[in-house]
Amino acid sequence: MKRITIGLVAAATGLFMLAGCTGTTGGGTTPTGTDSSAAATNAGGTIKIGLNYELSGNVASYGEESVKGVELAADEINAAGGINGKQIELIKLDNKSDEAESTTVATKLITQDKVVAVIGPATSGRFKASIPVANANKVPVISGSATAEDVTVDAQGNVQPYVFRTCFADSVQGTAMANFVVNELKGKTALIIKDTSSDYAVGLAQSFSDTLKAAGGSIVGEEGYVQGDTDFNSILTKAKAMTYDVIYLPGYYNEVGLIIKAARELGITAPILGADGYDSPTLLALGGASALNDVYFTNHYSSLDQDPTVVKFIAAFKAKYNAEPNAFNAMGYDSLRFVADALTRSDGQTGPALADALASTKDFPGVTGKFTIDAKHNAIKDIMIIGLKDGVQSTSVRIPASS
């Protein structure tokens, strides 16, 4: 596990004035107990925040891209004076895209490095693996992209007191895409091809199916694959022989890129739809530009958005990385700003006080949209539907949170 710290960062493009992004305080429930890490972290003159991300392994792109956003936010916050006069120090560790390693990383960050909060992992399974450590030590963990339905609640439906996410749940994505099929694409029938080894893909497929059926549509069939598969000929041969308006293909970029490429090579021309797992630079490399047409996916952010907050973020990101930001960059950026905002409102208090401030966040002006944290510690915000042309974002439709 490689440790990298960032502190006393030099001035960056687009200074982020912390007071200007502070969410208003609501009536969140304060977790009980005492914080064991606050004294240690505050005594050192910096505020330690841990990063538990997938920096190697099968979904490394998500972690790497999220970290870029976090680091940009840290640059801006530190250049603007830090949080209550203290600089942010990021301690970054690699969970290797592995659930057991995620638990190990969370344990080290919380019990040895004494961080006040942990951002990441990016994916739901790895994020859930870090939760027991967080709750036991009363240190908040935050993910910008863990979208599984059961991330912020336990098996009995009780809210996890130290667990938060700045993204919406999978059911929101599946529902939005099914409505998009009916209302925008004017489709009624769909074939589902899903990663049966992934709770993420299974959950998305279920919410899409339920919503499409409720709208009078139908699912003509379901096919499955598992993470790591590379030969999809059997599935796609069946798909080519069937009749449907769209293919719903929820999954991660590794397999999705290969499936879309193979489908187009077989002559399957139907629109292919998915979710935020598509948003990786690797999708284009795997699928190829010519295959990535008539492809749509739900997402948290679009670089086509002309909102001033988004435009400013894009300019700052390009100045630092010389690249167009994607949703994982934006979600990492928002996640650190969300924590910084709560630390400001908690007057630097950590543990239960920080968790309460996070839970009380209202109308936070995120790059991924203005959001409020609900009673289950989910972010309520708009959703974007992105259309690709030659693998590049060409259209975006904003669906209001109330829809």
Features from the language model and the residues they span:
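Short, low-complexity disordered leader/linker segments with a strong preference
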Residues: 1-48, 79, 400-403
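Beta-alpha junction/loop-to-helix N-cap segments that form part of ligand/metal-binding clefts
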Residues: 64-66, 80-154, 225-230, 257, ...
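Extracellular/periplasmic bilobed ligand-binding domains
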Residues: 205-298
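An alpha-beta-alpha
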Residues: 55, 158-223, 246, 339
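Segments of small-molecule ligand-sensing domains
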Residues: 320-329, 340-393
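Extracytoplasmic "Venus flytrap"
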Residues: 40-69, 93-100, 122-123, 193-202, ...
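Hydrophobic alpha-helical segments within soluble ligand-binding/sensing domains
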Residues: 102, 165-190, 202-204, 232-233, ...
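Extracellular/periplasmic periplasmic-binding protein-like sensory domains
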Residues: 260-333, 387-401
